């Protein structure tokens, strides 16, 4: 019941997906000309001269939505391998995943009741 060989294609995909951006940045770093100056340090606004300060402070409600999104996005990452090997793992893995999802639902209800998801 060793499930690691079933994920050979996943590991190959992960390796390729990691190497492509690393190689792109490496090639860019090697081939691109290096020039520093005041023009490089200014903010760029679609070809228009920048007006005002480029730093904008976001409201806290954006961070709360982002945090809840990340939590449930990570949940999907954990549930996907479980769903792929559901038949081999049996009822004990189903109960463990159910407990995991219930804990996340309880966290969502808590955030909802505390008003973390309220926009106004």
From Swiss-Prot:
Short name of any one Pfam family annotated for the protein: Oxidored_q4
Subcellular location: Plastid, Chloroplast thylakoid membrane
Protein name: NAD(P)H-quinone oxidoreductase subunit 3, chloroplastic
Principal localisation: plastid
Reaction equations catalysed: a plastoquinone + NADH + (n+1) H(+)(in) = a plastoquinol + NAD(+) + n H(+)(out); a plastoquinone + NADPH + (n+1) H(+)(in) = a plastoquinol + NADP(+) + n H(+)(out)
Keyword check for Electron transport: no
Function: NDH shuttles electrons from NAD(P)H:plastoquinone, via FMN and iron-sulfur (Fe-S) centers, to quinones in the photosynthetic chain and possibly in a chloroplast respiratory chain. The immediate electron acceptor for the enzyme in this species is believed to be plastoquinone. Couples the redox reaction to proton translocation, and thus conserves the redox energy in a proton gradient.
GO cellular component: chloroplast thylakoid membrane; NADH dehydrogenase complex
GO biological process, one term: photosynthesis, light reaction
Enzyme class, spelled out: translocase
Protein keywords: Chloroplast, Membrane, NAD, NADP, Plastid, Plastoquinone, Quinone, Thylakoid, Translocase, Transmembrane, Transmembrane helix, Transport
Membrane topology, record value: Multi-pass membrane protein
EC number in record: 7.1.1.-
Origin species: Angiopteris evecta
Transmembrane segment boundaries: 10-30, 64-84, 89-109
Assembly with partners or alone: NDH is composed of at least 16 different subunits, 5 of which are encoded in the nucleus.
Gene name of the record: ndhC
């Amino acid at each position: 019941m060793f499930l690691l060989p079933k994920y050979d294609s996943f590991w190959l995909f992960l390796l390729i997906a990691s190497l492509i951006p690393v190689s792109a940045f490496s090639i860019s770093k090697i081939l691109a000309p290096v020039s520093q100056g005041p023009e490089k340090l200014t903010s760029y606004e679609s070809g228009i001269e920048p007006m005002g300060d480029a730093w904008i402070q976001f409201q806290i409600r954006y961070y709360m939505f982002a945090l809840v999104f990340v939590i449930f996005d990570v949940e999907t990452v954990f549930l996907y391998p479980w769903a792929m090997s559901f038949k081999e793992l049996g009822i004990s893995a189903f109960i463990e995943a159910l407990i995991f999802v219930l804990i996340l639902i309880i966290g969502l209800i808590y955030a909802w009741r505390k008003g973390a998801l309220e926009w106004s």
